[in-house]
């Protein structure tokens, strides 16, 4: 993984060959200044208010995120979340082939979650891939992440059996609802990557027991009403 997380892309570029595939996490800050950057397969998992202290308006933030595909052609692919209003609208303008995923409804084409099973649909014909109980991740948002990853690999022609086996073996990465330990019957999770209200809400929603939430950080000109509302029925104590 290179880019905004992992190693610097410039360093890894020294070791790539013609058929190399790199996974790049690109921030809105980096996308502001791209010129020739052209990912064969791009993905936008969701767009929610963030970094408004930098971009000032939601419109400017969305424009920066969408620029990831500005150099794509009809030979390229863009993986988008059908349940996000911004990405669904953007799908009508994307220059490449759009691959949808959905955690809430069946799709004619794309990947979707239905009754704890993830499916791949082509022209209305759906193939069951696996039950989410076979994965090691928590939360609906992680099922969306899984579907996006499957779509990306599928676009590159990776055999589906290999994709599914990798999904089942994958464990949460650090700082993302990362299981830490169980002490005296209490499970501890590190979700410090939840640095905006939407990400923090998804972490709370993934918890299936009464939760003590420890939070901190600095204000990025976000609104916190929905985040606080998500405490209801989930968070029994908040430590700030």
Annotate each language-model stretch with its function:
Residues 1-8, 26:
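Short beta-strand-centered segment that lines the nucleotide-binding/catalytic pocket of NTP-utilizing
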Residues 2, 95-113, 164-168, 178:
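Beta-strand->loop->alpha-helix junctions that form or flank phosphate-binding loops
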Residues 4, 103, 216-218:
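Cofactor-binding loop segments of dinucleotide-utilizing enzymes, especially the Rossmann-like FAD-
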Residues 15-104, 112-115, 119, 130-137:
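Flexible active-site lid/hinge loop adjacent to a nucleotide/diphosphate
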Residues 97-99, 187, 237:
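Conserved beta-strand segments of alpha/beta enzyme cores
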Residues 130-235:
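Nucleotide phosphate-binding/pyrophosphate-handling subdomain across enzymes
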């Amino acid at each position: 993984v290179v880019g905004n997380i992992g190693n610097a892309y410039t360093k890894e570029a020294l070791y790539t060959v013609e058929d190399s595939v790199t996974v790049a996490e690109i921030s809105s800050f980096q996308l502001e200044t791209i010129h020739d950057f052209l990912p064969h397969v791009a993905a936008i998992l969701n767009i929610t208010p963030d970094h408004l202290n930098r971009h000032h308006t939601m419109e400017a933030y969305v424009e920066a995120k969408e620029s990831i595909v500005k150099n794509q052609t009809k030979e390229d692919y863009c993986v988008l979340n059908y349940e996000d209003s911004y990405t669904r609208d953007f799908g009508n303008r994307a220059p490449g082939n759009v691959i949808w995923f959905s955690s809430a409804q069946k799709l004619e084409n794309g990947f979707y979650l239905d009754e704890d099973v993830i499916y791949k649909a082509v022209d209305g014909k759906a193939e069951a891939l696996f039950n989410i109980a076979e994965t090691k991740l928590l939360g609906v948002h992680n099922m969306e992440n899984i579907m996006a990853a499957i779509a990306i690999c599928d676009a590159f022609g990776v055999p589906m059996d290999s994709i599914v086996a990798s999904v089942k073996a994958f464990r949460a990465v650090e700082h993302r609802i990362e299981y830490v330990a169980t002490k005296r019957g209490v499970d501890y999770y590190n979700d410090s990557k939840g640095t905006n209200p939407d990400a923090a809400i998804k972490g709370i929603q993934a918890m299936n027991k009464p939760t003590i939430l420890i939070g901190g950080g600095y204000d990025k000109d976000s609104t916190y009403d929905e985040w606080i509302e998500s405490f209801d029925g989930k968070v029994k104590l908040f430590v700030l």
